[in-house]
A protein has these predicted regions:
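N-terminal leader segment of winged-helix/HTH proteins
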Residues: 1-30
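N-terminal helix-turn-helix DNA-binding core of bacterial DNA-binding proteins
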Residues: 24-63
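Basic amphipathic alpha-helical segments that dock to polyanions
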Residues: 40-43, 56, 67, 71-77, ...
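Charged, amphipathic alpha-helical coiled-coil/dimerization segments
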Residues: 73-125
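Terminal interaction helix/tail motif
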Residues: 106-155
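Long, low-complexity, charge-rich intrinsically disordered regions
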Residues: 155-198
């Protein structure tokens, strides 16, 4: 088996191209581009600190202008809703509308991936996730990109009890489902100059 990083790159590129084709197919009936479908999927995965145009643009690697145009189109199609932050009225937040949720349910843009990985053992999936996560983390650090991640791996995550959680950075209580969503305030445990306890 070839173990070179170049083969990994070729495989990731090929998978990315195939997934883009799936996202293009998923959006075809609504005349949406893959970037629009990616934006909708992002909103299903983003937590309350990450559902802003700025965070979405960072995650998707888009310019402010491209993101703005994409959101205008999704808003006009009734697939997203914009609302003001409760604490800071200057901040615009985004969420899927009922139509947006229905679109993703009907289109199932990730079903091809689920089908393709159905026979891979959980252990092999874990190993692949670990290798790809390490590659992504290094790539983002080298390019000064925002890492994004879920609460359980974040240095700000505080477990108050078996079912009570808190974001130490923002000071907010978190629900169980929230702790599994992605956050752009994420900092890997041990990051930021703090030593991890042994």
């Amino acid at each position: 088996m070839d173990k070179s990083p170049e083969v990994l790159l070729e495989l990731v590129e090929r998978l990315g191209n195939l997934l883009r084709a799936e996202f293009r197919r998923a959006g075809a009936d609504e005349q949406l581009q893959p970037v629009h479908v990616h934006a909708l999927v992002y909103l299903t995965r983003a937590n309350r600190y990450s559902n802003t145009p700025q965070a979405m643009a960072e995650y998707l690697g888009l310019t402010k202008g491209t993101m703005s145009q994409s959101l205008l189109l999704l808003d006009r199609r009734g697939l997203i809703e914009r609302y003001q932050d409760d604490l800071d009225r200057r901040v615009v937040r985004l969420r899927l509308s009922t139509s947006g949720e229905q679109f993703l349910y009907d289109a199932q843009p990730q079903s091809a991936w689920q089908h393709a990985t159905r026979n891979i053992s959980p252990n092999r999936i874990r190993n692949a996730v670990s290798a790809l996560r390490e590659t992504l983390t290094t790539f983002q650090a080298d390019n000064e990109g925002q890492p994004f991640g879920s609460c359980s791996g974040c240095r700000h995550f505080e477990r108050l009890s078996a079912r009570a959680y808190r974001c130490g950075l923002m000071g907010d209580r978190l629900s169980g489902p929230e702790t599994r969503k992605i956050c752009w305030l994420y900092e890997e445990k041990g990051a930021g100059g703090e030593e991890e306890e042994e």
